[in-house]
């Protein structure tokens, strides 16, 4: 009787472990996605300056930085039928660390060096040894700079806001 209870409890435990693994994989994927967004919105000089503060491991370019075109698709009103809006230039690169992690970098424009640095950061974020260092010395300061810039632009836009209800109503 005790054996059957243990077996019955083992099956849900396996399901929980699989679910936990899936959540962990999804959170790592979400973290990489967020890191890529921060790097894509940062200037190449800022990324380069932050990377200089880290002792970078040996790495090789799997794919030399290259430039190409992508088709930008649009939708009218955000939910209409998709149409081809136009083409945009992009740069991409791939880097492999000596420990085996592979990183990919894409950025709008023709800045191949920025794409290579993004790929290097992507590989470093996947590494257990360098993930925390890259987060604290590269990603967090860049994220803070982007947030400050957005807040400053929002404040500038808010300062020029006109409340038409107050204008039309008038006094008297």
Description of each model-found segment:
Residues 87-89, 118, 156-158:
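A short, structural micro-pattern
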Residues 53-98, 104-105:
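Structured beta-strand/loop patches that form or line metal/cofactor-binding pockets in enzymes
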Residues 8, 13-16, 20:
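Acidic, Ala/Val/Gly-enriched low-complexity intrinsically disordered segments
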Residues 77, 88-90, 112, 147, ...:
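Short capping/connector residues at structural and topological boundaries
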Residues 32, 40-41, 125-172:
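Cysteine/selenocysteine-centered motifs that mediate thiol-based redox chemistry or coordinate metal-sulfur cofactors
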Residues 20-55:
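N-terminal, charge-rich interaction modules
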Residues 99-140:
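A hydrophobic, small-residue-rich beta->alpha segment in the mid-to-C-terminal subdomain
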């Amino acid at each position: 009787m005790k054996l059957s209870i243990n077996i019955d409890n083992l099956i849900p435990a396996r399901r929980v472990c699989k679910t936990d693994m899936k959540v962990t994989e999804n959170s790592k994927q979400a973290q990489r996605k967020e890191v890529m967004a921060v790097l894509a919105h940062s200037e190449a000089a800022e990324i380069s300056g932050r990377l200089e503060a880290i002792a970078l491991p040996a790495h090789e370019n799997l794919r030399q930085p290259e430039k190409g075109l992508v088709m930008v698709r649009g939708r009218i009103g955000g939910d209409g039928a998709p149409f081809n809006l136009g083409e945009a230039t992009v740069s991409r690169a791939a880097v492999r660390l000596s420990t085996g992690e592979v990183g990919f970098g894409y950025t709008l424009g023709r800045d191949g060096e920025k794409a290579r640095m993004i790929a290097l950061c992507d590989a470093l974020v996947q590494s257990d040894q360098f993930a925390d260092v890259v987060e604290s010395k590269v990603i967090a300061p860049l994220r803070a700079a982007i947030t400050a810039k957005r807040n400053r632009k929002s404040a500038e836009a808010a300062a020029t806001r006109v409340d038409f209800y107050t204008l039309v109503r008038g006094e008297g």
